Swiss-Prot record:
Cellular-component GO terms for this entry: plasma membrane
Originating gene: yfeO
Name of the featured protein: Putative ion-transport protein YfeO
Thylakoid listed as a keyword: no
NCBIfam families assigned to the protein according to its UniProt record, in alphabetical order: PRK03655.1
Transmembrane segments: 9-29, 54-74, 99-119, 149-169, 186-206, 223-243, 258-278, 296-316, 322-342, 343-363, 386-406
Species name: Salmonella paratyphi A (strain AKU_12601)
PANTHER family associated with the record: CHLORIDE CHANNEL PROTEIN CLC-E, ION-TRANSPORT PROTEIN YFEO-RELATED
Amino acid sequence: MFHPRARTMLLLSLPALIIGVASSLVLIAAMKIASVFQQFLWQRLPASIGIAYDSPFWIVGMLTLTGIVVGLIIRYSPGHAGPDPAIEPLISMPVSPSALPGLLLALIIGLAGGVSLGPEHPIMTINIALAAAFGSRLFPRITALDWTILASAGTIGALFGTPVAAALIFSQTLSGSNDIPMWDRLFAPLMAAAAGSLTTSLFFHPHFSLPIAHYTQMRLVDIASGAIVAAIAIAAGMVAVWCLPRLHELLHRLKNPVLILGIGGFILGILGVIGGPLTLFKGLDEMQQMAFSQTLGAGDYFTLAVVKLAALVIAAASGFRGGRIFPAVFIGAALGLMLHAHVEAVPAAITVSCAILGLVLVVTRDGWLSLFMAAVVVPDTNLLPLLCIVMLPAWLLLAGKPLLAANRHEP
């Protein structure tokens, strides 16, 4: 009844569904545990001893302690809590399963402790390793590369609550041929991404969109404004690109992860005191609070963007286990709101979406993901043509430029 191509796709459907659901459940479990732990550390515990959670003493002390604990996990756990996210790309080959408990624990403590990184890199590493370890036993004919693709697609769908991001990302890597069309290759990853996003939606839905005024009609001047905003965001991001490898090398001369992360946590605490609680944690909930605030002005948005960018660099350079996409979205939103406050003639929909596009492009160097993040934070179909046009000069600016990553050091 089915063509052999269709039968091949159907055979991959079951593993794809299982991987997608499992990827989402791992993410949900980690986020729920981190959320409970965060409420205890930042609400119940300080209230029980009569200290304000936003006091300088508590912020500096909590982040310093978080750094020390994560450092102890990295030093003494099997596999040293997985690869350093500052060195490894978001999607890479499977790591040893023995490193996963330490990696998961380091992630949860970092998220709960207020570190300015998201969950995407460790969750991706965990899901890829689990998929390869269990999948190779259950379905030995499927290669490790296929398990990596399915797990990463399922994780992307779970992280962003939609399979669209995975479809966009893998459409540029799983190109078709005369024998196998691109959509044949995309079928199983898209199935995994759909399963991951639907499973996530049963428990919670990521809140990316901001309450920003509707963009009515594209004008020529808006394209120029958007390109300038994206260029400003790229310039800010390139400062981080320059700083990260140098700071990473400087800190890792100490050799001891407990000392490195303790110092990193202390600096993050100082930055948290300067920027306030909005600059702590992964940034999604804080971005909503920032957008809904009626008291913040241009200077406040500028401070939030600069402090969060510095915190992102410090956290990544120190070796905290976390991702850089979610903080980059926060930085882009803060930068966009600041630019709109300075030049109100440029709609906030343009400044925010184009700033996010520029920052995420610097962090990921992935045009589709950058467009996707800009479009989901400012969900306005009238903006899509403008964002696609603005992407062109932004991509030209970054062509051949170094990535936001540290260099490997000899032990």
